[in-house]
């Protein structure tokens, strides 16, 4: 079963929000007027619904996200916890976990990815065979999203090589391929390889720095 953020993760972040412990320091400078994020001020709080997976069931959990405002031009920014990705209700561990299952397997299909022990991850009312489940098209969209984190991945590689100049990461990334039956266009091929590269970079980054590229790095580069 791919990992998921837990209720405890979300509750812990909510407590940080309530205690004013969320700062803008890991946000990028304002792209409009170049003011550094350390000068940003709290603008608003926005409730966000997250979908987590508990014992094969998809359940909702709620948490407040903090929006900061640039004092130079009034542009606003959302500070995301490391279990969140912009515009996605499912948590980052679920998104990366299910996506990795597909791109790292030569034979896995999208339909097989959403199945665990011959059962599909579904919603609490799934006593009916017609009840909604995690859709295979959702996995496809997640892979597309993760393939777009090019700046984050590029910077992560630089940091990894600075820490360990003899790292095998560049060699490992260069020889990545995907089965031809998994794509029909060169664009999709690039997206699949890009997602697979992110999965490998994340593993290297976790092993080297004991933290995720999503904790600060992805936020710093505006999830690009």
Language model: regions and residue ranges:
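Short helix/strand-bridging catalytic loops that position acidic/His residues to coordinate divalent metals
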Residues: 82-87, 97
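Short amphipathic alpha-helical molecular recognition features
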Residues: 86-90, 131
């Amino acid at each position: 079963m791919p990992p998921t953020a837990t209720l405890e993760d979300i509750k812990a972040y909510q407590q940080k929000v309530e205690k004013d412990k969320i700062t803008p320091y890991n946000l990028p400078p304002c792209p409009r007027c170049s003011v550094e994020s350390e000068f940003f001020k709290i603008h608003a709080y926005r409730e966000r619904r997250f979908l987590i997976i508990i014992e094969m069931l998809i359940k909702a959990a709620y948490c407040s996200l903090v929006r900061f405002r640039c004092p130079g031009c009034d542009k606003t920014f959302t500070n995301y916890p490391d279990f969140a990705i912009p515009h996605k209700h499912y948590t980052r561990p679920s998104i990366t976990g299910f996506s990795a299952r597909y791109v790292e397997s030569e034979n896995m299909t999208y339909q097989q990815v959403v199945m665990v022990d011959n059962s599909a991850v579904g919603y609490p009312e799934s006593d009916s065979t017609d009840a909604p489940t995690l859709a295979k098209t959702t996995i496809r969209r997640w892979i597309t999203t993760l393939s777009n984190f090019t700046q984050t991945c590029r910077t992560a590689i630089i940091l990894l090589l600075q820490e360990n100049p003899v790292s095998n990461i560049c060699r490992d990334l260069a020889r990545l391929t995907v089965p031809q039956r998994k794509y029909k266009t060169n664009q999709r091929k690039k997206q699949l390889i890009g997602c697979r590269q992110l999965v490998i970079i994340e593993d290297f980054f976790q092993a080297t720095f004991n933290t995720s590229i999503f904790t600060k790095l992805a936020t710093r580069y505006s999830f690009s």
